[in-house]
């Protein structure tokens, strides 16, 4: 399989927005914007790894059992099947980061949620 994303795909979520900047065989690049004080679900992916690069703002990243703090120009790598989430630690400024997904099957359906502030855990 490959990516099910195409350039220009976008969506709004309770925590902010995402937009596909580029995609190809086994990769996808997204720009993700997180509202002030918002947090994404604690989740993992069965088929993809992710690389996050902070472009603007400050973040707290849960990676497995660790809490990491990242600022502009810093990055984090999320291996396949690793629980993770990101929180915008600012009360006023949006957090923007670039997400690079790599794997054999890239699809929005590859999200296993464990905790979610917006009632999306199944």
Describe each PLM feature range:
Residues 2-13, 85-122:
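Double-stranded beta-helix
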Residues 6-44, 48-49:
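A short glycine-rich, His/Asp/Glu-containing loop-to-beta-strand
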Residues 38, 47-48, 66, 82-83, ...:
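A generic "binding-loop/recognition-motif" signal
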Residues 41, 61-63, 86, 99:
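Short hydrophobic/aromatic-rich beta-strand segments that constitute the beta-sheet cores
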Residues 47-60, 64-65:
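Glycine- and acidic-residue-biased ligand/ion/polar-headgroup-sensing regions
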Residues 64-83:
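Short acidic-glycine-tyrosine-enriched beta hairpin
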């Amino acid at each position: 399989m490959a990516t099910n994303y195409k350039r220009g795909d976008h969506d709004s979520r309770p925590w902010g927005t995402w937009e596909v900047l580029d995609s190809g065989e086994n990769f996808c690049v997204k720009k993700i914007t997180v509202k002030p004080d918002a947090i994404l679900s604690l989740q993992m992916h069965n088929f993809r790894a992710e690389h996050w690069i902070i472009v603007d703002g400050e973040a707290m990243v849960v990676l497995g059992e660790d809490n990491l703090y990242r600022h502009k120009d810093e990055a984090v790598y999320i291996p396949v099947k690793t629980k993770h989430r990101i929180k915008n630690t600012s009360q006023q400024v949006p957090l923007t980061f670039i997400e690079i997904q790599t794997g054999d099957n890239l699809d929005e359906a590859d999200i296993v949620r464990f905790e979610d502030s917006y009632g999306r855990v199944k």
